[in-house]
Amino acid sequence: MSVLRSIPFASDIIEEIAGIIGNESSTGEGTVIVFPGKRPSLYLKARLATLAGPRAFFPPRCFSLDQFIDEIARRQNPGYADIDHGDAAFILFGLIRSLGAFERHALAGKGFGDFLHWGRHLLSFIDRLDMEGIENSALVNVERNASIGYDVPQSINELLSNISLIRSEFHRVLGEGRWFTRGTKRIAAVEETGVRVPDDLRRVVFAGLFGL
């Protein structure tokens, strides 16, 4: 069961979460805390240690949101590595040069240095689609409008008019290389929790969502 609890901005969120956890910190029972970033967990653990006093203290597992997604995504993909932006852009560059749909594309005959600027934008766009869970089937309007022409260079319109093809092939190459982008990591995490919720994640407190 999901419960949404509104905490006023003037309240001490660390104190509020410590109260939600209650005595679990002394028993090691499994509440997981997810903050927008890493630092709040340090304050929470310090507060719980103070409340525990001389008793044995087992702090709850705490994650930033990105760490939480990473933890879930790697359960079925333990050997995957995070790919950096330059390497990811180079994969996109290779796809533009090798896919038949881009045989006559202006960027297909240029070097990586000429492609890198737009490659980073293309990577960011694909990553955003993945992070927001947008399926290729929903990109029909983007591709249709790009065929008519957005207010960007024609070479970029040609890329966008085939964005679903680029994205599918990009995902394929990432899978073969056992690499994660931030977006594909999110996809893997959704797939992992889509069938069932792992036993150790039955009680998760997402705290400070206003900070996202």
Where are these predicted regions, by residue range?
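N- or domain-start disorder-to-order transition segments that initiate the globular core
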Residues: 1-21
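Short, glycine-/Ser/Thr-/acidic-enriched flexible segments
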Residues: 9, 39-40, 211
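Short coil/turn segments at beta-strand junctions that form active-site/ligand-binding loops
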Residues: 25, 29-31, 200-203
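Conserved RecA-like ASCE P-loop NTPase motor core of nucleic-acid helicases/translocases
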Residues: 28-40
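Short hydrophobic beta-strand that contains or immediately precedes a catalytic carboxylate
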Residues: 34-35, 62-63, 205-206
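Basic/charged alpha-beta structural segments of nucleotide/phosphate-handling enzymes
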Residues: 38-198
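Extended, H/D-rich, highly charged conserved domains that either
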Residues: 197, 203-212
